[in-house]
From Swiss-Prot:
GO cellular component: chromosome, telomeric region; cytoplasm; nucleus
Post-translational modification: Ubiquitinated. Proteolytically cleaved by the proteasome in response to transcription stress; the resulting N-terminal form constitutes the activated nuclear form and the C-terminal portion is degraded.
Region listing for Contains the proteolytic activation cleavage site, in residue ranges: 500-530
Biased composition (Acidic residues): 298-328, 337-358
Source organism phylogeny: Eukaryota, Fungi, Dikarya, Ascomycota, Saccharomycotina
Name of this chain's protein: RNA polymerase II degradation factor 1
One GO-annotated biological process of the protein: DNA repair
Species of provenance: Saccharomyces cerevisiae (strain JAY291)
Region (Disordered): 69-455, 467-503, 640-688
Subunit composition and interactions: Homodimer; may form higher order oligomers. Interacts with the large RNA polymerase II subunit RPO21; the interaction is direct and serves to bridge RPO21 to the Elongin complex in a manner dependent on transcription stress. Interacts with RAD26.
Length: 738
């Protein structure tokens, strides 16, 4: 075989080192451009990450294959790179040696190649393209198998656009058919072959799809004809892991050949006689098949090169048309069909729907997989319908038919009459295929957006209803409970509420249920469940002393042990709070933002409140995991929302500590029956306990910062090393830090 093949085969083990991302890219590219080997592609893939840019560069001719005949000067860096680089072929490409030798020399062993070739993941398309690639031909008897026509042999320079090259080259087509010695020149033609292979190959498949049964018996008589069919069939029957480009090519059915590659002149003659026999039978179905061909080509082009615009495609298809005409002068029988095909292709190129964005690729691929004949496609995006269509009788297609699928869809999707009208107007000017496809995409997109909108609306509706019902419940509770409970101390409430109190206690014992208002962790506000005091509210809500709003940190309420003063205090302020936010934090936990709405993540609570061992609760000393080392006091009396008359903290810290203890004792000793006067006047306005606490807390925080700064400054003056700033670790101000 050719040196190129030997090189790549020799190194086949090294392809295992290729990382999977690169490998999948190379797979895809080898399918789109059959005559580029993976070796050719490796360097491009390594140089450009994005598949689309690579495809653009290859199709526009900015990048050409490395080959022995003509080395374009600009691309020398590629050659150097490629010579140094150990060649890494595709393990699972069909083995070109197998395909080509059996094709040319002995046609009878039609099954061997596919058994040898290690590819599970390629469809028939892969095999055919392999056979068609001119890469490895050396001897004269190897015939280039590109659908019976010769791929132009002119090397592609960087300057000529490949469209120009194609049109020039069609002159050579007919004479070159049988003698095929010019191997090297063939090597040089990069782009034209790859584009045309893709399309011709597509056409062949489509034609074969049409006539499975007619030719079943002929396979036995003519192994030469059937060799390619069997190849495709066996490869198709293995289970496959496919790259997306492979998926995009329509699934092969059992295959018949109408226009086979010109393998040699004798077979060509045999073939022509066959065609004469079949002609009357297959006339109608072949017209249909031709139309399908064009559509399938369009689809493949669109999936393969979603980023290309129309300008790119026009030259490609035109070049193909010229070639087809040149070639089919030999196969006189098919001329009429070709004419139709060409018209349709021109139309397709002109059609505005042609440019398909990457977003729509998904839609397309699914359409291609189940590939219904286009004329029966009820292009409603429901897979069952698509899968039924191939069994329906197939009629030759008339351009008027696309209006039928529309009428079928209209009852199903009455929501979109306007869109469909627009579509109909557009579509009367468009060719069959582009039309059906565009419609399919648009419909399926509409379908999805509709569904999303409906779901969204339903969710909103449910949420609103929940919210309303909660508001009502809450209002009822407020009406029933407040009077009786303001007279009861909390401890005498019904056994049920005590049970709830115990549950709350149990839950809040554990750290992660954010029982400390200061506790936070990074994801905390991402879920609705974790707004600040939320746990308390949910569980204590039914003890209608809805504690949460009264006293922000409501350390105690869950425990069922706080005295009557809290109960009364809570009720007075809870009524006000209820007026303000009718659905408590239960319905919308986010409302409850503990620090007066401005949530200061660290300063406001990190230093003072974050850790459990800082805050033994009075009533509950036994339940709390940690105790303070000095006799049990905590630094700010937030419990009942009284304002602590903060001592002047600038004075000596010890006096401050002792004063605090005294104020605590006073608070504890107040008789339980009589609620303390809650509302104080500030600026002539009543201050609710929440605000008091915020003022107090903020004041303490300021003190603490000032103190820390002062201590640090003093330490700096005295030359004490940095960390030792003379804190008294027992004093209240330094405790939250360490």
């Amino acid at each position: 075989m050719s040196t190129q093949f030997r090189k790549s085969n020799h190194n086949s083990h090294s392809s295992k080192k290729l990382n999977p991302a690169l490998k999948s890219k190379i797979d895809t590219l080898t399918e789109l451009f059959p005559d580029w080997t993976s070796d050719d592609l490796i360097d491009i893939v390594q140089e450009y990450d994005d598949l689309e840019t690579i495809i653009d560069k290859i199709t526009s001719g900015a990048v050409t294959r490395w080959d022995e005949v003509k080395k374009p000067a600009k691309k020398e860096k590629y050659e150097k790179k490629e010579q140094q680089h150990s060649y890494v072929p595709q393990q699972h490409l069909p083995n070109p040696e197998d395909d080509i030798t059996y094709k040319s020399s002995n046609n009878s062993n039609s099954f061997t190649s596919t058994k040898h070739n290690s590819s599970n993941n390629y469809t028939q398309a892969r095999n055919k393209k392999k056979v068609q690639t001119p890469r490895a031909h050396t001897t004269g008897k190897h015939v280039n198998l590109d659908k019976g026509k010769h791929v132009p042999s002119k090397p592609v320079s960087n300057t000529t656009s490949w469209a120009a090259a194609v049109s020039v080259d069609t002159k050579h087509d007919v004479p070159q058919d049988s003698n095929d010695n010019n191997n090297e020149e063939l090597e040089a033609q990069g782009q034209q072959a790859q584009e045309k292979n893709q399309e011709k190959e597509q056409e062949e498949q489509q034609q074969q799809e049409g006539h499975n049964n007619k030719e079943e018996h002929k396979q036995i008589e003519q192994p030469s004809l059937s060799s390619k069919k069997t190849t495709s069939r066996t490869s198709a029957s293995q289970p496959k892991k496919m790259s997306w480009a492979a998926i995009a090519t329509p699934k092969p059915k059992a295959v018949k050949k109408t226009e086979s590659p010109l393998e040699n002149v004798a077979e060509l003659k045999k073939e022509i006689s066959d065609i004469k026999k079949d002609d009357q039978k297959s006339e109608a179905s072949e017209e249909k098949v031709n139309e399908q061909e064009t559509s399938a080509q369009e689809q493949e082009e669109e999936t393969a090169e979603p980023s290309e615009e129309n300008e790119d495609r026009v030259p490609e298809v035109d070049g193909e048309e010229v070639q087809e005409e040149a070639e089919e002068k030999e196969q006189v029988k098919e001329e009429e069909q070709t004419a139709e095909e060409l018209e349709q292709e021109q139309d397709n190129v002109a059609a505005p729907e042609e440019e398909v964005t990457v977003v729509e690729e998904k839609v397309e691929i699914s359409a291609v997989i189940s590939e219904p004949p286009e004329d029966q496609a009820n292009t409603v995006p429901q897979p069952q319908q698509q899968s039924q269509q191939p069994q329906q009788p197939q009629q030759p297609q008339q351009p008027q038919q696309p209006q039928q699928p529309q009428q079928q869809q209209q009852p199903q999707q009455p929501q979109q009459p306007q869109q469909q009208l627009q579509q109909q107007q557009q579509q009367q000017q468009q060719p069959v295929q582009a039309q059906a496809q565009a419609q399919e995409e648009q419909l399926s997109q509409n379908y999805y957006t509709q569904q999303q909108q409906q779901q969204y609306a339903q969710q909103q509706h449910q949420l609103q209803q929940q919210y309303l019902s909660q508001q009502q419940q809450y209002a009822q509770q407020q009406q029933q409970h407040p009077q009786p409970q303001s007279q009861q101390p909390q401890s005498q409430q019904s056994p049920q509420s005590q049970k709830q109190g115990n549950n709350v206690a149990a839950q809040q014992y554990y750290m992660y249920q954010n029982q400390f208002p200061g506790y936070s962790y990074p994801g905390m506000f991402d879920s609705q469940g974790y707004a600040y005091g939320q746990q308390y509210q949910q569980l204590a809500q039914n003890n209608a002393q809805t504690s949460g709003n009264a006293n922000q940190y409501n350390f105690q309420q869950g425990y069922g042990q706080a005295g009557a003063n809290t109960a009364a205090a809570n009720l007075t302020s809870a009524a006000a709070a209820a007026a303000a936010s009718p659905a408590t934090a239960h319905a919308q936990p986010q409302q409850q933002q503990p620090y007066g709405g401005s949530f200061m993540p660290y300063y406001a609570h990190f230093y003072q409140q974050s850790f459990p061992y800082g805050q033994p609760q009075y009533g509950v000393a036994g339940q709390y995991p940690y105790q303070l080392p000095k006799n049990n006091y905590n630094y700010y009396q937030t419990q009942n929302g009284q304002e602590q008359q903060s001592p002047n903290q600038g004075v000596a810290q010890h006096s401050e500590d002792s004063q605090q203890k005294q104020s605590q004792q006073q608070q504890q000793q107040q008789p339980q029956g009589q609620p303390q006067p809650e509302v104080q006047m500030q600026n002539g306005q009543p201050v609710n306990p929440q605000q008091q606490m915020q003022f107090q807390q903020y004041y303490q925080f300021q003190q603490q910062q000032q103190q820390a700064a002062a201590a640090a400054a003093a330490a700096a003056q005295q030359g004490v090393p940095y960390g030792y700033n003379g804190y008294d670790y027992n004093s209240k101000n330094s405790r939250g830090f360490y």
